[in-house]
UniProtKB/Swiss-Prot annotation:
The keyword DNA damage applies. It comes from the Bacteria. PANTHER family: DNA REPAIR PROTEIN RECO. The keyword DNA repair applies. NCBIfam families: reco (TIGR00613). This is DNA repair protein RecO. GO terms for biological process: DNA recombination; double-strand break repair. Pfam families: RecO_C, RecO_N. The lineage of its organism: Bacteria, Pseudomonadati, Bacteroidota, Bacteroidia, Bacteroidales. Involved in DNA repair and RecF pathway recombination. HAMAP family: RecO. Belongs to the RecO family.
Length: 241
């Protein structure tokens, strides 16, 4: 059955000489995998350039029962980027977040609030014309709400530890090893106070920002089965050095 929808590109894999497999987070059906023919002429209904990290596209696909790979028939840009592909900092963030979402998003069901969050975040980054060096950290922290992993801040006091396993601040050092000492726990509390509009008001050094990035990666690895150390992590750390 042919169905039109919109979605956000997460990952593209060269399948063979004639096709690519593209993972897309769609508005109506959540995450799904699609077969995309490699264009052989300029008149092709599907252009390869559409499937860059975090591209937002509108497309028509053939959804067939009992299949987990659907063929895209037509595609076009749903939101043409203004700056994201052309700014090396923004495009590197997009590459990192696309890899993160490819590993973290596993549900194959509609989730309107999550899709709206992703759409808003990508548009905000593309349109931003001021400091966005903390964007990826704020994105990762806010995203954890949709997985039920957002830390409980009610018990935070100066000098608390952060129990990464139980996602809460505690006054006594946990018996297990997955925790942050008070100094680093305070940075996590600071990060949780940021949003896209206010994050430029919070000063973080290169070392602090990179450490927070590693902590967030470790946090997701603790809570999501088979979540890896992201390959683009080092690229992002170098970029904002």
């Amino acid at each position: 059955m042919l169905q039109k929808t919109v979605g956000i590109v997460l990952h593209t894999l060269n399948y063979n000489d004639t096709s690519n497999i593209v993972d897309i987070y769609t508005r109506e059906n959540g995450r799904a995998s699609f077969l995309v023919s490699v264009p052989r002429s300029r008149k092709s209904a599907v252009k390869t350039v559409l499937f860059q990290p975090l591209s937002m596209i509108e497309f028509e696909a053939d959804y067939r029962p009992m299949s987990n790979l659907y063929r895209i028939k037509e595609a076009k840009s749903w939101y043409p980027f203004r700056t994201l592909p052309y700014d090396p900092y923004k495009s590197s963030i997009a590459m990192f977040l696309a890899e993160f979402l490819y590993r973290a998003l596993r549900e194959e069901a509609e989730n309107g609030p999550l899709f709206a969050y992703l759409e808003h975040s990508i548009r905000w980054l593309d349109e931003c014309d001021r400091s966005f060096s903390n964007f990826h950290l704020v994105f990762l922290m806010r995203f954890s709400r949709f997985l039920g992993l957002y830390p409980n801040t009610e018990d935070y006091r100066e000098g608390c530890f952060f129990d990464m396993l139980n996602a809460c601040f505690v006054s006594v050092r946990p018996l297990h090893g997955a925790f942050l000492k008070p100094e680093e726990a305070s940075r996590i509390n600071l990060l949780m106070r940021m949003n896209y509009e206010t994050m430029h008001l919070f000063t973080m050094s290169r070392l602090e920002r990179n450490r927070c990035l590693v902590i967030m990666n470790d946090y997701y690895r603790l809570h999501l089965p088979d979540f890896p150390v992201l390959k683009s992590l080092d690229v992002l750390k170098e970029l904002f050095s």
